[in-house]
Regions:
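Short acidic-glycine-tyrosine-enriched beta hairpin
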Residues: 122-139
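Short beta-strand His + acidic residue motifs that chelate non-heme Fe in jelly-roll/DSBH
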Residues: 98, 118-119, 136-137, 141-148
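Short coil/turn motifs at secondary-structure junctions
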Residues: 90, 143, 158-161
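A short, N-terminal "cap"/entry segment at the start of jelly-roll beta-barrel domains
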Residues: 3-8, 14-90, 166-168
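Short, conserved beta-strand element in jelly-roll/cupin
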Residues: 84-87, 101-118, 156-159
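A short beta-loop-beta micro-motif enriched in histidine and acidic residues
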Residues: 62, 75-80, 91-108, 149
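A short hydrophobic beta-strand segment most commonly corresponding to one strand
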Residues: 82-84, 135, 148-166
């Protein structure tokens, strides 16, 4: 009998952990709620992968950086762009420090190596180091203020095709 009670308790605890309250402000799990299901159709996606090769770094959006496309845009039908950005040393403020924004739905940046310092409208200046991550809201004005000679970033953007607007 005790074994059956323990099993029932464990099952109840597992059910408690695996349900979330829909619309909750935090990721805490709540008893008795269910997770919302995706109902809108999604673009077809296909499996893809990318291995590191130095020769894959090429010119891109910024003249002061080289980009390694990770092949995500074609695999997601243009829904997502992902690339590694390698900044070209040395930092040249006259070329790099131009205020701009990106007309995107989502932009996430993760520092792989080195550091980068940027200023964001309404947020001030921040220095990010290897292991740091940030999200830039759509159209937030920002300026790169500096970066290390070995700076590399992973950038993920939605949609894959977006406009960058330079401000003077």
């Amino acid at each position: 009998m005790a074994k059956a009670k323990r099993k029932a308790k464990a099952t109840k605890a597992k059910a408690k952990r695996s349900t979330k309250k829909v619309g909750a402000k935090s990721a805490k799990h709540t008893k008795g709620a269910s997770v919302a299901k995706h109902t809108k159709p999604r673009k077809p996606q296909r499996f893809t992968f990318s291995h590191h090769r130095e020769e894959d770094f090429d010119q891109g959006l910024r003249t002061y950086a080289k980009y390694r496309d990770l092949g995500i845009a074609p695999a997601t039908g243009g829904m997502v762009q992902a690339h590694v950005i390698r900044f070209i040393p040395p930092f040249r403020p006259e070329e790099v420090s131009t205020p701009h924004y990106h007309d995107v739905d989502f932009q996430m940046v993760y520092v792989l190596k080195g550091w980068i310092k940027s200023e964001f409208e309404g947020e001030g200046a921040h220095t990010f180091y290897a292991g740091s991550c940030w999200i830039q809201p759509p159209k937030i004005k920002h300026t790169v203020l500096g970066y290390s000679d070995d700076c590399e970033l992973l950038e993920i953007v939605l949609p894959a095709d977006f406009e960058t607007v330079t401000l003077e």
